[in-house]
Amino acid sequence: MIDQFERLPGIGPRTAQRLALHLLRQPEEQIHSFADALLAARSQVGQCQTCFHLSAEPTCEICRNPERSIGMLCVVADSRDLLALERTREYAGRYHVLGGLISPMDGIGPEMLQISNLVKRVAADEINEVILALTPSVEGDTTSLYLARLLKPFTEVSRIAYGLPVGSELEYADDVTLSRALEGRRAVE
């Protein structure tokens, strides 16, 4: 069980051991409830057909919300980044989840991400601005430059400001930093 917990992101050997020992001390019905919740989440949660965010419905709550601006599209690497931006309550547009970042060293090319769907979406919809909210790293910069080249013929492209430390992950940034990063976005040259 410890080995399984260690496979989770951000869980080291000591935390994995602590979690395993905690579960072993729980009543059997609580362990069954926990296991059932995991299995239910895995079988009931998929991806939104529009933005590729996690959703129990074919179209997620954000994409269905008529109060969200259809003219603004924020591109993120994964759902954790989307949730981090949502916590700021500063952004009222829609999203597109790539499913990762271009990383040739890890064997991840553009064709492995939701990039072709993004280009089709931007070309077909009335999107006035695409905001690239990608981690400030080599992979994030590479992906941003690649996307900017593809999307500029269709719409304005900006990137969130570099208020985030280089090499950091979006999901760990505090709400104020993310809010300022959104406010300070600029056009990609």
Swiss-Prot record:
<protein>
    <recommendedName>
        <fullName>Recombination protein RecR</fullName>
    </recommendedName>
</protein>
<comment type="function">
    <text>May play a role in DNA repair. It seems to be involved in an RecBC-independent recombinational process of DNA repair. It may act with RecF and RecO.</text>
</comment>
<keyword id="KW-0863">Zinc-finger</keyword>
<keyword id="KW-0227">DNA damage</keyword>
<dbReference type="InterPro" id="IPR023627">
    <property type="entry name" value="Rcmb_RecR"/>
</dbReference>
<dbReference type="InterPro" id="IPR034137">
    <property type="entry name" value="TOPRIM_RecR"/>
</dbReference>
<dbReference type="GO" id="GO:0006310">
    <property type="term" value="P:DNA recombination"/>
</dbReference>
<keyword id="KW-0479">Metal-binding</keyword>
<dbReference type="Pfam" id="PF21176">
    <property type="entry name" value="RecR_HhH"/>
</dbReference>
<dbReference type="Pfam" id="PF21175">
    <property type="entry name" value="RecR_C"/>
</dbReference>
<feature type="domain" description="Toprim">
    <location>
        <begin position="71"/>
        <end position="165"/>
    </location>
</feature>
<dbReference type="GO" id="GO:0006281">
    <property type="term" value="P:DNA repair"/>
</dbReference>
<keyword id="KW-0233">DNA recombination</keyword>
<keyword id="KW-0862">Zinc</keyword>
<dbReference type="GO" id="GO:0008270">
    <property type="term" value="F:zinc ion binding"/>
</dbReference>
<dbReference type="InterPro" id="IPR015967">
    <property type="entry name" value="Rcmb_RecR_Znf"/>
</dbReference>
<dbReference type="GO" id="GO:0003677">
    <property type="term" value="F:DNA binding"/>
</dbReference>
<comment type="similarity">
    <text>Belongs to the RecR family.</text>
</comment>
<dbReference type="InterPro" id="IPR000093">
    <property type="entry name" value="DNA_Rcmb_RecR"/>
</dbReference>
<feature type="zinc finger region" description="C4-type">
    <location>
        <begin position="48"/>
        <end position="63"/>
    </location>
</feature>
<keyword id="KW-0234">DNA repair</keyword>
<dbReference type="Pfam" id="PF02132">
    <property type="entry name" value="RecR_ZnF"/>
</dbReference>
<dbReference type="Pfam" id="PF13662">
    <property type="entry name" value="Toprim_4"/>
</dbReference>
<dbReference type="InterPro" id="IPR006171">
    <property type="entry name" value="TOPRIM_dom"/>
</dbReference>
